[in-house]
Amino acid sequence: MASAGPTGAGARPPKAFTAQAGLAKLVNPAGLNSILARGKEKFGGTQAWKELMGCDVIFARSISHWYGIKGTTYYELTVALGQPLYKPVTDPELTEEEKAVMTAVQSRFAQSNSSVVLTRTLLNKTCELKDRIRELTDELGQTEVHLAREKVKAAALKLENRKLFVENQELKDQLEKERTKHGWKGLKTLCLWIFLATLIGGYITGSNAACTLVDVPSPMKVGYDTFKQMCIHKDSYLPDGAFDKESLALECSKQMDYMDCKEVITDSISGKTSFAGMLRDVFRVDEIVTAIRTVVRFAMDFSLAYPICVMFVLILTRNKKHAIISACCALVAKCCGLRLLPFTLVLTYAPSETAIAGCIYGLGYISIPLVTFLHWVGLVLKAILVPDDCYIGTRVSHALAWSIMLPMWIITQELMAFTEFPLELQIVTTVVVCTAGFGFRYLTGTVTITEPDGTVKKYKRIFNAKSAIGTISTVFFEKAKAIRGVIPSFPSKADNIVKIEVDVDGGSAGVGFRLGNYIYTAGHVVGEAKIAKITWKGLTSQAKVLGHIELPLFTDTLARLEIPKPFQQLPVFRLAKSSENDYVQMVCFDNQLQNVVTFSGWANIDGDYLNAPFETYAGTSGSPIINRDGRMLGVHFGSNAVVSQGFVITRLFATEPAVKQCKSDEDLADEIVRKVMGGIRISFASLTSELEKQRDELNALKQMVNDLIDTDLVALEKKKGKTKRTVRGQKHKTKAISKAAFMKTKVLTEEEYRRLEEEGFTKDEIKDIVDNLREQAWLDYQNQLDEEGDDDWYEQMEEDQRINDQIDQNIERDLEDRGEWYGQRKITFKQRAMLRFIQLGRQQQVATVSFPDGYEDRAEELYNKVVTTEDLPEGETSEAALSLPNKIVHQAGKRLNFKHVKIHPDKTFMKSGVTQIEEKPEGDIILKAKTTTLAPKEEPVIQQVEQQPQVEQQQQPQQPVVEEKKRTPPPKPQRKPKTGAKAKCLDCGETFVERQDFHVCKSKN
């Protein structure tokens, strides 16, 4: 069989010619229209002209001489014996340049065909995406319905929780009542209740349940029904002008006897009084005056001794324990001859040794100097030998002070024995001395404060008292004139907040405040962190998270942190006394968490929930919300649109809140409520996160559809003869890979990425490296496309020439045997099977395999071996195409096994190219150069083969031709050839080197 290349009679050797890139883009319309018109005049209406018009590309040599190319076959239209002759030619009389131009134009039309196929593919993908969007929309609707049901369930559970909470509170109150019912506190409460009930009952009880007429005029008369409601068995007053006895009796006679009615009405009137007498009677003026006179007379008779002593006794017996101790003290004081008040003070403040020493002296067994000396020695020895939390010097000083106080107490006892100094006078004297000595001294004392930055401030407490009185007055008047619509001024609390940061779960930041001896913030700010970083006035320290306080019927918690030692001067918030709708202010930091900012607005309070029109941002969670007095009202936890969501903590901190401690059986109801709320919180959070995921996926799909809609899709009209499903139309389909696919390709492995990080590259630098690699891959891919579109013509030309020669010989043989006129025969053309493989990833691989006629099964078998069922990882793409005369198979996104793409070559063409880009402001200047070299045929063979007849070798069909293009790896150092043992072929007798030469018997070539 003839080898590739023009053969046969009249064949001319191909001239050296180089086709330029972009040749298919050139157009030369000069004279073409007129030539076509003249050709139609000469050949129009003939079958030969119709066949010529069915070619892909037509070239006019002259009016009577035309060439056409269809697929890989050239056709010629001439005039023979005055008749048009249309026939296929093997070697057309065309120059290489003319052939190159026709081939380039033909490839352009094939590319248009592939664009139509790509358009249909994109339309199909668009329809699939729309179906997917419709499915996701349905799922979203179902999710929203499910969420609505869960919300209804949550509302029902919330209502049930409120009922359980109220019931639990009632049970707690009942339990508390049962505990204190028979105790000391319950007994005192019972006595006080009986006393107050007696007074109130005597105060409100009327004399006789009847009406009293008041001497005032009235324009209206009362009816019997009204009179009955006001006066029958009731103590009330009735204007004399509204009372008409006869009218009332007549109206009453409708129901009972007239005389009985008059008797009932007369009995219901107790008498008549003036308006002033009515007022004195209603307000019990006479009784109040009498009670006051009685108390004054009692005080005058018994002086102040009785009430003062009563208060003294009540304080001493404030509970059961102190009542027993006070009784013992009174007994000891009586036995030892000591005054009760000084002895009580000594027992309260002095060491027990001092009280014992006084009792010993009171018994009369020892003198004052001796008891003072022994007392002094004992206290000092105890201070020296018995350590405690105080410094030894402090303990000795205290011992010395009480050693001096003992003789003073004894001398005072002796002086009081010679004078009349009653108990009430002792109590009053003690109160006056303590008030003057300690109260005024504390009030006028100077306070020194050292700020964290080192500045020292001094002020007197009396000035703070004055300012407090002024502030209270101002707040009172501001409260009185509070009007919605006029925002009041708030006290500055810029120094009362701190910034809180944690590094757990990606890190978070918020605001904290001091309340009592702890710092508080929103629970989600610290999360599960154990340590938080706190910043105040530029000073940063670490604080331990002590726990979380559960908020009743709320989805968040309140985190409690300890106060670091450097932050002991952090100002403390005071709780608001009441929570009601009013203007409030939220104190927080700005977006950069640097400067203090405030939000002011009207707050709506519903139970423990607080809503205010604050458009907050990330980092404001945990901010304190204060009222117009500067007192702590609530805590900010988040925002819904432009409405701040907060929680009122005034009732929460009315008692010490629990911080995740163990619960007793009595708190079982609270535990159930908290567990139910926790379940609702978790289910709601999971539903919300799932809904957000579906929304994100839906938005991504919508964006993909919008991108596809915005993409310009070229839909060209089909031309006659271009619908044939051959590989020329199919192979360009693989070129329609966008640059966006390359910019998403994964070019670095995990090991390479970690190695770059270990070498000190930042994320931005690594991103730049990856982008450069992807850009270079895109340029290499474009170069390969240009090579396939522009430089494959030589190999294709040789293969086409071989097939055309064979067809031409068969046609000539048939013409000679049958003698038929060519214009009456069917057109003969050749269709070939072709494979196309492309895989783009870290390594780009492209391969094209074309087969001669009759090898369709082998092409399909090779296609099935190369294309696997394994999906490519994210960032890599692949396409495989099989073109047969009767079908086209296309597969994308599967891994391709290029190991099976191989043949036994007889010729090898080596290619090398370079692409250079010069960047200019107006655009890039691109240079592409390529060199193709025919490698010399090697002496083949790797093993011995069996001898076969020469005839079978000649009848063996032409092997398929394969083209495989890969990214050229970096050059590796060439090793020196190894010298192996020589061997001799048993068939042909040729000598070759083992493990080095590839040997094939010459008789089989």
Swiss-Prot record:
Statement: the UniProt record of this protein carries the keyword Membrane: yes
Active-site residue list: H524 (charge relay system), D556 (charge relay system), S621 (charge relay system)
Protein keywords: Covalent protein-RNA linkage, Host membrane, Hydrolase, Membrane, Phosphoprotein, Protease, Serine protease, Transmembrane, Transmembrane helix, Viral RNA replication
Species annotation: Avian nephritis virus 1
Stored Pfam families: Astro_VPg
Any one GO molecular function term: serine-type peptidase activity
Similarity section: Belongs to the astroviridae polyprotein 1A family.
Full protein name: Non-structural polyprotein 1A
